[in-house]
Amino acid sequence: MSEAKNLFINGLWKNNSALVQLLGLCPLLAVSSTATNALGLGLATTLVLVLTNSAVSALRRWVPGEIRIPIYVMIIASVVSAVQMLINAYAFGLYQSLGIFIPLIVTNCIVIGRAEAYAAHHPVGMAALDGLATGLGATAALFVLGALREILGNGTLFDGADLLLGHWARALRIELFHTDTPFLLAILPPGAFLGLGFMLAFKYVIEQKRRQRQAQRSAVGQALRGAAPTDNHEQA
């Protein structure tokens, strides 16, 4: 398996930053009230991860080990500031909706964690791929949680998509069922904790079934290999 493929498998599933490492829970739980907000913050975090990993990797030979963490934080803060200004300029509605959670990307453990654990020890191309894979994994978790909360809470999907994609995206709004009274448990923070818990349990069940299938295939293979010499001896 190539290293690039392994990076994407780990980032999206095996070592997902949100569902396995449980990093960045503050924005994950606070912003995921709608699919649009979750997708917007996830894409912003992905862009920050790619740019930060690339910068850290490119500068790794000139960064003294004793002060590497403050330098990484300065790089992350610079990238986040640039991304924040881009969102403010081109998606002002989303900028207002996400509020303080855009600059809080600076303190996100996912970003500093990948810079320290991977980008500082690998070339620029692989570091950028690692940032992309990690960011897409976090975005997927954010989006699924946001979509579930929006559907259960308001009966809609992609409500406010125009904040992220422009006026044409209003056509993307789907009303799955009409409700005059939103389901507040899903919309408020307790719903975020419950939704994340169900997602963790679902991933655990899938992993357990996969391990059981692998164990069964391994047992069958060993049984067949053990039976082969016996069959050859009987034929002789």
From Swiss-Prot:
Coiled coil: none annotated. Residues 217-236 are annotated as: Disordered. The chain crosses the membrane at residues 18-38, 39-59, 69-89, 92-112, 128-148, 182-202. It comes from the Bacteria. Keywords: Cell inner membrane, Cell membrane, Electron transport, Membrane, Translocase, Transmembrane, Transmembrane helix, Transport. GO terms for cellular component: plasma membrane. It holds the Pfam family Rnf-Nqr. It is a multi-pass membrane protein. GO terms for biological process: electron transport chain. The complex is composed of six subunits: RnfA, RnfB, RnfC, RnfD, RnfE and RnfG. Belongs to the NqrDE/RnfAE family. Part of a membrane-bound complex that couples electron transfer with translocation of ions across the membrane. This is Ion-translocating oxidoreductase complex subunit E.
